[in-house]
């Protein structure tokens, strides 16, 4: 699969069932408000679990559980720093995916569209 939007490195072929399942798992991870809040906070930079929990107003154990799910899906990484684990987004693709989801939601809310003129 490729990377990008609007003609920039689009996938060269339709998704097969395995790739479709992987994409669905990623999108399911984004379908949980608490995970979106975590990813949005990490969009601003790496944080240890304690700071992340405080920033989004969740219990540390709940944040740790959600981070484990996000890590297993390849959306975040954790690096040990002394006795803490500092989490960050896996890469810029995760930030772009998050940005596009937020952008799309805002456009729907405002009744806007970025449809190409030939899209009818």
From Swiss-Prot:
UniProt-listed InterPro entries: ArsR-like_HTH, HTH_ArsR_DNA-bd_dom, Metal_resp_trans_reg, WH-like_DNA-bd_sf, WH_DNA-bd_sf
Keyword field: DNA-binding, Metal-binding, Nickel, Repressor, Transcription, Transcription regulation
Residues annotated for Ni(2+) binding in this entry: 91, 93, 104, 107
SMART domains attached to this UniProt entry: HTH_ARSR (SM00418)
Domain HTH arsR-type residues, every copy: 15-109
Outcome following mutation: residue 91 to A: No change in activity. Lack of regulation by metal ions
Molecular-function GO terms, alphabetical: DNA binding; DNA-binding transcription factor activity; metal ion binding
Domain of life: Bacteria
SUPFAM superfamilies: Winged helix' DNA-binding domain
Record-annotated DNA-binding residue ranges: 49-72
Pfam families membership: HTH_5
Documented activity regulation: Binding to DNA is inhibited by nickel and, to some extent, cobalt ions.
Subunit structure: Homodimer.
Name of this protein: HTH-type transcriptional regulator NmtR
